[in-house]
A protein has these predicted regions:
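Structural microenvironment flanking redox-active thiols in thiol-disulfide oxidoreductases
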Residues: 81-119, 129-136
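Hydrophobic beta-strand core positions in alpha/beta domains
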Residues: 69-71, 102, 146-147
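A short beta-strand-turn-helix
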Residues: 38-41, 46-68
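N-terminal targeting signals for export/organelle localization
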Residues: 1-50, 156, 167-177
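Short pre-active-site segment immediately N-terminal to redox-active cysteine/selenocysteine motifs
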Residues: 66-68, 72-76, 141
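Thiol/disulfide oxidoreductase modules built on the thioredoxin-like
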Residues: 114-122, 128-175
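Active-site acidic short loop of glycosyltransferases
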Residues: 64-66, 96, 121-122, 139
Length: 177
């Protein structure tokens, strides 16, 4: 292999290797990893974390009676940034019927409040220090969202996020109301 080809191959690998860690493949139907798919039909794992910026600790039980989206995300994840305005729009479209909790898996909470401000969302963001909540849910990539029905049962899992996924989420929410 020539030196030029070797460098080109190394650059290609360096650029493409991180992609599965942030983005995944949702494809409209909500692809899910094997570990996460075990959650479908089971009660959403409970947790109790304080929102970044203050307030009382929250978790799935805090939103009983509402359709809940538990979204695992990170500040370094570009598809996460795209998904947040969609979640905010869904909250506004279904007032009082839907809730969203963003669970950050970042190593430190430093950029979470800034991320929330930049994306313009008003739903609570919590920091999963030590990633114990992520360990219970087992998200396969960032972002991964778990759609939980009004009884607290995980009904759907979405890995990754692409423009256009809002329609699938809206349809799922309507079916659970």
């Amino acid at each position: 292999m020539s030196r030029t080809r070797g460098v080109a191959l190394a650059l290609t690998v360096a650029v493409l290797a991180p992609l599965p860690a942030c983005g995944g493949a949702m494809g409209g139907g909500g692809a899910k990893s094997g570990a996460a798919s075990d959650q479908i039909g089971a009660p959403a794992p409970d947790f109790s974390l304080a929102p970044v910026g203050g307030g009382s600790a929250i978790g799935p039980r805090s939103f009983a009676g509402k359709v809940l989206i538990v979204d695992f995300w990170a500040t370094w994840c570009a598809p996460c940034r795209q998904s947040f305005p969609v979640y905010q729009h869904l909250l506004e479209k279904f007032p009082g019927q839907v809730a969203v909790v963003g669970v950050s898996v970042d190593d430190a909470p430093d950029g979470i409040a800034k991320f929330q401000s930049e994306t313009g969302v008003h739903f609570p963001l919590v920091w999963d220090q030590g990633q114990s909540v992520a360990g219970a849910y087992k998200p396969g990539t960032m972002p991964t969202s778990f759609v939980v029905d009004r009884s607290g049962i995980v009904q759907k899992i979405h890995e990754g996020f692409h423009q256009g996924d809002e329609a699938a989420l809206e349809q799922e929410i309507r079916s659970l109301l």
